[in-house]
Every structure is written in C-alpha cells, then in structure tokens.
Amino acid sequence: MKCLFIVNPSSGRLNFQNKIKDIVGTLIFDQICNQIDMFYTEKKDDAMHRAEQLTEGEYDFVVAVGGDGTLNEVINGVVLSKSNTPVAIISAGTVNDFATYLSLPQDTKGFCEMIKEFKLKTVDVGKVNNKYFINVVAAGMLSDVAFRVTKDKKAILGPLAYYLEGAADLPKQFFNPFRMRFTTETTTVEDEILLFMVTNTQSVGGFKEISPMASTSDGVFDIVIIKKMNLLQITPLLLGILQGVHINHPAVEYFQAKKVHIENLSEGVVNVDYDGEFLEDGFPLDVEVIPAGIQIVVPN
C-alpha cells in the first residue's frame, strides 16, 4: 500500500516524533506499506491545502497526525479534493474526541495492525457555513477554551490546561447567558442559553457521553442545548454529564436534525468552535449533515 502522512510536528509531547518514526518503520519493515510520503505542516491550513491536492487513487490512505485541529484540516482537504481517500488517525492532541469515540489504537503495534487489516468505516461529515467538521460545532460556556489555550500549556499540562482555563472562566460565563434561536426541519427553539453543541459523536471535550444517542452513521446530528439555570441546578447537571444522563435535566434540550439554522439574538459577540478551531465568519450558522461523507480506517 501507498500512503501519505500529514504531520503537525507541534502536536503532542516531546517523545511523539519518536513514536511516528517507530510507526513508519514498522509499516515498511513488516511490508504493510511499500511507500510512505511525509508532509510536515508549518502553519495553519497547511494540512488542509495538502489534503485538498489529493487525487483519486493517488494514495491508498492518508494519515492525519496531530490533534483535533489537524484532523479537522485533513477532513476539510479530503472532502474538498473529492478523492474519496480513506483517512487513518494518529492522535497527538490534548483531547482527541473523535479518535476516542471510535476507539482508535494509539500504540505502534495496534495502529500498524489496524492498517494491515484495513477495515474502513464510512462516517457522516458535518458542514457549518463553508467549513467541514467531523465531531462538533459549539458555542458558549467553555466552548472556546480549545483555541484559547496556548500550545506550550497544552504540551506541558495536557488536558489539565483546558480544565484550568475553563475553571477561570466558568463563574463569568455562567452569569452571562445569551439568546439563541435554533430552527430545524421540524422545530424551533428560542431561549437564554449557556452553551450549545451540534455533535456527530458522543464524545466532546473529553466527556464520553455528551450526546448519548449520537452515531457517526445515522445521517443526523445530535443537538445539546444547556439553558440558563440557577446555582442549585448546576451540580446535578455536572453529575448527570459524568453519568451520561444529563439529557433528562430540566435545563437541557436534546434533539436530532439533519439541518439546523442557528441565530445569535444577543448583542454581544459569541465565538463559535468547530472541532477545536475558531469559526471566523460566525453567526448565523447553517449546519447540515453530509451522510457517508468520508471513510475512516478503524480496528476490527
């Protein structure tokens, strides 16, 4: 097999580059791959632009090496290329929600065995305005932590960097809800909210059951809205999130849709996150699912 590695060298801890060398060496030595081309990113959008150049049949698969942001760029590039190139994932980021949801192996032996077996899973892709995503679009409380935490903090502290940044912002954001309107094919929801997530998988922000009914192959999004609440309601909500039963909380709205139009009815600016990246054009949002939009290499 012939493959292309698209690597974000700034992702992961200090020993991560040695891990990549081990994986590449094993793929060649065990004759799983007979050609491996390497592309290293230097700046934002490099991964997307390289993946966008792919042509059908040029490679048997492309490997996204980095965090959720790198994976997002590769997904955008592959979709835009229309090459239908399968994507394998080596996670080096801080949270790695999509890889967690699919239980993708991260050790050298497990990854190489997965490539050798080469089982493909066709999954849905999301589109928000003119960008594609694989896991989540979110806005509100804690949702912008991913792109505010510096690379140095993530490299040193790992997931703790997110928790510290989020804890500092939580009191301020809790008392500043914003009004949003959500319009789907069948319903309209308008309310004062703290956070919303349009999800493709169950795992968001390191929490494995944020959207307990979500599936990457059902052709719909799961939409989670956390409404304005009082202080007495927050502890039961947090406990519910940890147990995956928060959708029964009175301040939570949970529904599924193929498309959703989202309007910010507040005066203030609300940042939008898609797969850990900042969505520059912001509101209003038109989010739609692209059923069976991409192929992912998964373990048996």
PLM regions with names:
Residues 1-62:
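ATP/NTP phosphate-donor binding region
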Residues 9, 65-67, 90-92:
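Glycine-rich beta-strand-to-loop/alpha-helix junction loops that act as flexible
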Residues 17, 184, 190, 215, ...:
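ATP/nucleoside-binding phosphotransfer catalytic cores, i.e., glycine-rich phosphate-binding loops
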Residues 30, 41, 80-194:
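Catalytic core of DAGKc-family lipid kinases
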Residues 69-82:
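Short Gly/Thr/Asp-enriched flexible loops that form oxyanion-binding sites at enzyme active sites
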Residues 138, 142, 197-210, 278:
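Glycine-rich phosphate/pyrophosphate-binding beta-alpha loops
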Residues 151-161, 212-233:
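Gly/Ser/Thr-rich active-site loops/lids in small-molecule metabolic enzymes
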